[in-house]
């Protein structure tokens, strides 16, 4: 008893949602596949490709830590801000310090800030 494609489509059109759900589960079990897998794989691959192509990064101060005065000094050195502005920036984290910088510069500045106890993110 061979079914052609039109008969299969007609049967699927007449089926209830519960019957279609059972059909999908049976197909997944029979062939060892899942219906959601292609979506997750495609999304993951696109995100990975975007991360590799990124050439500009943002340096974000997430927190000052316990040595706030040292962090303020380094922030002033990095940004060229005055004492008052640097203190306000450090007190109101998370805040971007530099935007659109090269990865090497971002990593150097991150290391400098972490050295004095700040928590920093590179995005």
Curated annotation (Swiss-Prot):
Disulfide links within the chain: none
Keyword annotations: Ribonucleoprotein, Ribosomal protein
Keyword presence, Ubl conjugation: no
Coiled-coil region: none
Highest taxon, organism lineage: Bacteria
The keyword Ribosomal protein is assigned to this record: yes
Gene Ontology BP, a term: translation
Any Gene Ontology CC annotation: cytosolic large ribosomal subunit
InterPro entries: Ribosomal_bL12, Ribosomal_bL12_C, Ribosomal_bL12_C/ClpS-like, Ribosomal_bL12_oligo, Ribosomal_bL12_oligo_N_sf
GO MF annotation list: mRNA binding; structural constituent of ribosome
The protein's role, per its UniProt record: Forms part of the ribosomal stalk which helps the ribosome interact with GTP-bound translation factors. Is thus essential for accurate translation.
Homology family: Belongs to the bacterial ribosomal protein bL12 family.
Assembly and binders: Homodimer. Part of the 50S ribosomal subunit; present in 4 copies per ribosome. Forms part of the ribosomal stalk which helps the ribosome interact with GTP-bound translation factors. Forms a pentameric L10(L12)2(L12)2 complex, where L10 forms an elongated spine to which 2 L12 dimers bind in a sequential fashion.
HAMAP family the record matches: Ribosomal_bL12 (MF_00368)
Name of this chain's protein: Large ribosomal subunit protein bL12
Gene designation: rplL
């Amino acid at each position: 008893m061979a079914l052609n494609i039109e008969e299969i489509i007609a049967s699927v059109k007449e089926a209830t949602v519960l019957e279609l759900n059972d059909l999908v589960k049976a197909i997944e079990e029979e062939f060892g596949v899942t219906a959601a897998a292609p979506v997750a794989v495609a999304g993951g691959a696109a995100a990975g490709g975007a991360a590799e192509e990124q050439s500009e990064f943002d340096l974000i101060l997430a927190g000052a830590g316990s040595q706030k005065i040292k962090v303020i000094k380094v922030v002033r050195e990095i940004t060229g801000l005055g004492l008052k502005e640097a203190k306000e920036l450090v007190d109101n984290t998370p805040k971007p310090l530099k935007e659109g910088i090269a990865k090497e510069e971002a990593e150097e500045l991150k290391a400098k800030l972490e050295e004095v106890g700040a928590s920093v993110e590179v995005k």
